[in-house]
């Protein structure tokens, strides 16, 4: 199990005192050290205390700027106080009298932690005057005046209240991250003001906040709105390129040892000050924590450390799936004589401000979701960060004093491999969910929606195609009754389809735990230590065996049910090497999904179906109903080919219970793909062809022009030909033609399969006969 946070150092007495000190601090409901705030803070009108920020000198001016403009762009260095102080200023200026002040964040961790911090500064209980809402967790009330939320939650608000009548101010924070949902919110808010709806509040204000972005472009998009710059420089940060990664290493992200070495060198050779290390994800972070702890334990603090005031190193991981209490620890000051080292994902680059950081180690990579046109799927990839992200990271070292940033890559890597700015998510990921949302908002022409950066038309057409395959839209591109139901679920469309199919068969109990487990981080703990690794793998195999050993989806359901029914779920998770925090989140998700299904089944026109068969077959049939795009057929040996027209080869992931049984399988359905040395299918179960026989043809029925809902009167014949040519070119690029499609369909029907089996048996019988004749001749 993970031992972190942990202190590595000399003098057990000193270490134990430090741990007791930290435990006492954790008993306080605080995200920052209250004593530290009071020492250097100032008093707000609410009677609380807040740190000193550059924005405080601009308080009156920025309040007036919000009053005078429908749209306002606010920019300033990270740590200038935009996120925590501006909503408070607007509240104290009376803006909340006309509705809530809504503040969006791209990540749920940031939304929760910032809400906690502001609630403390305003001396109120979290969920009362200050609250938050993230997916599956709403900590707000009728009393809430300042509401922090993920951008996805605001999009859900707009579905139920297109004119945002419950809000007086909308603040879109961290706009420079260019998440898919934030870009859609840009367009919706612009459209709301352009249409001048009689139901829209005249006093609604929109503030877009960004640390680094193309501000002139954003201002032009919002009608040349003013840009309010918060002056205030950071302390100087000295940068050093460590030259451990060059342009040739772009695809090689096995750099953990280098990161740990640089971090340890800082601890041994630099004066007091905390360290912030940037890595890409949970596995890398936990592995680095283990390696760093082992190295720090061997340090002789009498001879090895230049700063004689140091007695140890406090190692703290930080990533999205951690519990709120675990995340809170990174904000607390370390015990006396202890240096703090936070090893984090990109969340600490912009969304969270950690006091005391003097040294930053920039790993140079980030996990990013990219659409793979060959596979037709979104793939989570490790890619080089942009130059603007790198500057954000280094800025963390100059918040409270001068600092240093150690970039493990070379200057050539900076120049050749790192783009200037973040590529907007809308230009590189699937648009299926947001296109469905736009359709449900009666925005039918999604191609000519006001995008800040228009996405590739192919991504839009791919989204329309998938929605049509799920029956969320009809042949004309209009949203169906099923589509209106699907948009209520905070799940991907294909998973929502599977859940609704199960509900129609009155067996949602089979699917809801699985849907909940697929909505949280990976629940399996895979330790770095080889001895613990073997034990964990054995426990995981035992859990898979209880599910029949032949269905990864069912394994997730077994884990959910067994943990929930155990008397001590946290202990059960520890014994079976399962992340308890992920299971705890899954329990909450399942309860909310169950409530959505309950309301859906109360509708008089909800479809009802019957099926008589074993539970395991019902489960797999429901999965086929939603995941038929992710169906694959065995090709050669252990390789499977997808049936979506691309024929992409995939392999079953080694973590699957079916990994050693590929040659026994003919047809599978999978949850997602992972690209490493091969393209792997993750979370797999076997299926029968007859379960998807009637579904697979839908993968090839697609009329781009009709589904796009472009107004017919505005489209001439040459435009129609353009749509048709695009589809023909796409099919040629994918290596598939109409003749091939027909052959595939013929190949997969019952008669073809029966004929192929007969030919195989005939050849086998002929070979046996020939072999027998040969033996007679030689005998």
Swiss-Prot record:
Q: Please list the coiled coil stretches.
A: none
Enumerate the PROSITE patterns for this protein. DEAH_ATP_HELICASE, HELICASE_ATP_BIND_1, HELICASE_CTER
Catalyzed reactions: ATP + H2O = ADP + phosphate + H(+)
Q: Where is this region: Disordered?
A: 1-53, 737-779
Keywords of the record, alphabetical order, are:
ATP-binding, Helicase, Hydrolase, Nucleotide-binding
Q: Where does ATP bind?
A: 76-83
Q: Where is this motif: DEAH box?
A: 173-176
Gene3D superfamilies from the UniProt entry: 1.20.120.1080, P-loop containing nucleotide triphosphate hydrolases
Helicase ATP-binding domain span: 63-231
Q: In this protein, which residues make up the domain named Helicase C-terminal?
A: 263-442
- According to the lineage, what is the superkingdom? Eukaryota
Name the family the entry cites: Belongs to the DEAD box helicase family. DEAH subfamily.
Q: What PANTHER family does the annotation carry? A: ATP-DEPENDENT RNA HELICASE, ATP-DEPENDENT RNA HELICASE DHX40-RELATED
General function of this protein: Probable ATP-dependent RNA helicase.
- The entry's protein name is Probable ATP-dependent RNA helicase DHX40
Organism this protein belongs to: Pongo abelii (Sumatran orangutan)
